[in-house]
Amino acid sequence: MKSVITTVISAADSAGRFPSSSDLESVQGNIQRASARLEAAEKLASNHEAVVKEAGDACFGKYGYLKNPGEAGENQEKINKCYRDIDHYMRLVNYSLVIGGTGPLDEWGIAGAREVYRTLNLPTSAYIAAFAFTRDRLCGPRDMSAQAGVEYSTALDYIINSLS
């Protein structure tokens, strides 16, 4: 799984060298942010059901037409699948926060997502709206510390930009 540390080590090994000073600075920065990332991961894990529900509700609130016949949320089963997908992505955000890299999102969430959603007639804009709502809803210090919020928002921005 890709993280800052595994990326640095892989690059150095591929080049047949030891990690450079800038490589080690990158690892050090990643380690310094670990506490904030773990705080964000813990807060997300302890509140994930509410986060997923609010994100899904925001998605269907903004794109109400999705519940029309022939659309992605035309029945309860399909609506539940949308919430399930949001939950899946939020777990991947959690995993990414824990490891300090985008590996889980890249490997298990984003690769091919646009093509799959297009094939299934699922608009990525609805998922983007759900993740943007979740990012914008964050309120420090109510939800988490400012630095943890930055780490959390950065992970959500990564999903949003990848699906855009």
From Swiss-Prot:
InterPro entries: Globin-like_sf, Phycobilisome_asu/bsu, Phycobilisome_asu/bsu_sf. GO terms for biological process: photosynthesis. Pfam families: Phycobilisome. Its main location: plastid. (2R,3E)-phycoerythrobilin 2 binds at residues 47, 137, 139, 142. Contains two covalently linked phycoerythrobilin chromophores. It is a peripheral membrane protein. One of its GO terms (cellular component) is chloroplast thylakoid membrane. The keyword Membrane applies. It is found in: Plastid, Chloroplast thylakoid membrane. Keywords: Antenna complex, Bile pigment, Chloroplast, Chromophore, Electron transport, Membrane, Photosynthesis, Phycobilisome, Plastid, Thylakoid, Transport. The keyword DNA-binding does not apply. (2R,3E)-phycoerythrobilin 1 binds at residues 81-82, 84, 88. Light-harvesting photosynthetic tetrapyrrole chromophore-protein from the phycobiliprotein complex. The light-harvesting antenna system in red algae and cyanobacteria is formed of phycobilisomes. These are composed of the phycobiliproteins phycoerythrin (CPE), phycocyanin (CPC) and allophycocyanin (APC). Cyanobacteria also contain phycoerythrocyanin (PCC). The phycobiliproteins all share the same subunit composition and organization with variations in the covalently bound open-chain tetrapyrrole chromophores. Heterododecamer of 6 alpha and 6 beta chains. The basic functional unit of phycobiliproteins is a ring-shaped hexamer formed from two back-to-back trimers contacting via the alpha chain subunits. The trimers are composed of alpha/beta subunit heterodimers arranged around a three-fold axis of symmetry. The phycoerythrins also contain a gamma subunit which is located in the center of the hexamer. Belongs to the phycobiliprotein family. This is R-phycoerythrin alpha chain. The lineage of its organism: Eukaryota, Rhodophyta, Florideophyceae, Rhodymeniophycidae, Gracilariales.
